[in-house]
Amino acid sequence: RDAADLRYDEWEYTRRLEVDEASQGQIGYVHLRAMGGGNVTEWYRDFYPVFNRQGLIVDVRHNRGGNIDSWILEKLMRRAWFYWQPRVGRTTWNMQWAFRGHMVVLVDEWTASDGEAFAEGFRRLGLGQVIGTRTWGGEIWLTSSNVLVDRGIVTAAEFGVFGPEG
């Protein structure tokens, strides 16, 4: 790992600590730097320890995209519909790991591609508020199959994106 990755990790970690301290442990924080298959591990690592808090911040600022927006949205859409209360211990509920609190998503001008799709899906599905600045604006599927003679790559829009209204 290079120094830039380590600085980014520190930035992410300090955001998590700040949220935890400012909310006295009542709000969880999950940052996803991208939406690739490898980022599923980050989701598991960061979401499950905070799934039972009163609030959740999902930070997709600087998100480079990928293709797991639907997978994460599915996890956030889960709803508990009944509960178990043991004589001793904590209440549990069906739809294990269903988040039951308030949620927001943070975006910025560096939120790109599938990070934008995630934020738009979050908003359209009524999961919570999207907060931040206008995103990158490239919520399109790109292809990198256009390899040049010098082995460089030209990315070009391959699929446009639109909502149910057209």
What are these regions (language model features)?
Residues R1-G152:
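Cleft-lining beta-strand/loop regions that shape enzyme active-site pockets
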Residues L148, E158-G160:
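C-terminal regions of proteins
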Residues G160-G166:
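Amphipathic beta-strand/beta-sheet edge segments enriched in Tyr/Trp
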